[in-house]
Amino acid sequence: MIIRKRIWPRTLSDFFSMTFILTIIPIIYWFQLWVVLPAIHEHGSLPYILHFLFGNFIMLNIVGNFTYIIFCDTSTRRDIMPISAANTKDGWRLCASCETLAPPRSWHCPTCNICILKRDHHCIFTGCCIGHYNHRYFIMFLLYLFVATTYSFCYNNLFIWNRMQFEFPMSFIKIIFPLAIFIFGFDGTTNQFYLILYIVSAVGMLYTGVLCIYHFCLVLNGNIANESNKKIHIYNLGWKQNVKEVLGNRWYLTWTLPYIKSQLPHNDKLYKFKKILQ
């Protein structure tokens, strides 16, 4: 893996989004394993140990995949080819912004200011583009975020509803609009803080769930976002091969840990086309 030269966000939106992720994930992790879990299961019991280990397994995958996403260089910086050697029939084209030839399925990112190999999109939460080399880690990062927020939401239901006393209509307002405390009076209790984390996990579950459906459909259909928007489907090789194109030849193991090596079935400049019957 080639390391990116610059890993810090380039725009304010990227900076604040990435800062939010780097802040909220450790807070939720602490809340679930050191506040919620001991309140539901007795410390040292078998359910407590199993849930504690599972929570750390999820956290390891979230942090590991996030790290690989931001450090992995998936740009065309090392793929310079002389104009005479490139073939437009293979998908090579001239990028006016980079003033060089761009490989097939690569697109220029105005934020990263370079062409990205098999560019899917620019992710504001990681401050970089998702492309050929880090697509696998993005998919797994998204999957484990959804698992984590769903897992948190289910346990938070038991924790919040057993802990808080509800009074209509203020309790209803606090649940639906937790920031309304700044209008109706600041509530500095720990219950209000826990309630905000409960809302964050619920919103996170819905948000990552929608993203999982969208991006998993792209992977299964052999598409990236730009191609899907333009109705380009010539890279659809069947669901299994499409999955290998993103997760690698050992695709069935990539969900376990981000450190598992899984070689991609082709290089970064040549992609198989689906045979189209005339």
Label every PLM stretch briefly.
Residues 1-278:
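Membrane-associated feature with strongest affinity for ZDHHC
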